[in-house]
């Protein structure tokens, strides 16, 4: 079992972050926020996929003015992503928004930040203090020569202390870069010095394939070491893909379970069925199942018996047929043509139990 870092609680709307709460899954819309209908449609799809907090870009006044309607109709808490403009921040705070993200790399006027924090405190609005390698303060770039892990951690600690010095504690921190090792080190430095909750992720990770791998490595290592209270996988892809990858990472570390986990062998010369096709069909059909189930689909008997004992249900394939098993007990033999349908029917019954 992973021993998670002890952190203080932060609330974004009704969602608790830190203090032992389950790791919260986040994403960000890719719509124009002032297009209220498109933004709400995407938020609803993401919420259905398992997103628990959503962030929206607020680059212009028209986006800030759209927030009230979005917040009112969103099924999950909404965070406004604010850069450069304190005025946009204040407009956003009037919308009833649940949280805002501030980047000290591009809003570093302490007077304005203090005013924003005071308004957040008055309205009970949470803040994410977001430090990013691509927008680090000039003084730290001059000190370290580049956005090193130490520079990122120093920025996060400096601004955290400033937030607390003006009496604001309802915030979490994110320290992100696209370099996995830099990201891990920066978050570890910060985590050792404070109990502030951390939002973790690899920013600008890239397209779905490469980005998922980078995210799994970077996020997975931090989570294994107990660091991270909320997480986003950032991909150049449909945001719904981000949600799938997040839950797969959390499931692999036994931190949260949602939906079906498929265990299948890599295939070899012993298999006598088209296992890749079987697995593909099963995976596609089970995307909508939310119940945590472990499904084993094995190509031969070598590991099938052992996996059957660990899985909720599965197939042990042989010569153009398979044994369907449930909780390690063989149920019946099915033909290659029937195996997918029989397995799916049994899983549907389990999902309804």
UniProtKB/Swiss-Prot annotation:
GO molecular function, one term: 4 iron, 4 sulfur cluster binding
Matches recorded under InterPro entries: Dihydropteroate_synth-like_sf, Enolase-like_C_sf, IspG_bac, IspG_bac-typ, NO2/SO3_Rdtase_4Fe4S_sf
SUPFAM superfamilies according to UniProt: Enolase C-terminal domain-like (SSF51604), Nitrite and sulphite reductase 4Fe-4S domain-like (SSF56014)
Keywords associated with the record: 4Fe-4S, Iron, Iron-sulfur, Isoprene biosynthesis, Metal-binding, Oxidoreductase
Record has DNA-binding as a keyword: no
Binding-site residues, [4Fe-4S] cluster: 265, 268, 300, 307
Protein name: 4-hydroxy-3-methylbut-2-en-1-yl diphosphate synthase (flavodoxin)
Cofactor binding comment, as recorded: Binds 1 [4Fe-4S] cluster.
Family from the record: Belongs to the IspG family.
Catalytic activity, reaction form: (2E)-4-hydroxy-3-methylbut-2-enyl diphosphate + oxidized [flavodoxin] + H2O + 2 H(+) = 2-C-methyl-D-erythritol 2,4-cyclic diphosphate + reduced [flavodoxin]
Protein function: Converts 2C-methyl-D-erythritol 2,4-cyclodiphosphate (ME-2,4cPP) into 1-hydroxy-2-methyl-2-(E)-butenyl 4-diphosphate.
An example Gene Ontology biological process: isopentenyl diphosphate biosynthetic process, methylerythritol 4-phosphate pathway
Family matches, as HAMAP family: IspG (MF_00159)
EC numbers on record: 1.17.7.3
Cofactor(s) the record lists: [4Fe-4S] cluster
Pathway(s) per entry: Isoprenoid biosynthesis; isopentenyl diphosphate biosynthesis via DXP pathway; isopentenyl diphosphate from 1-deoxy-D-xylulose 5-phosphate: step 5/6
Superkingdom as given in the UniProt entry: Bacteria
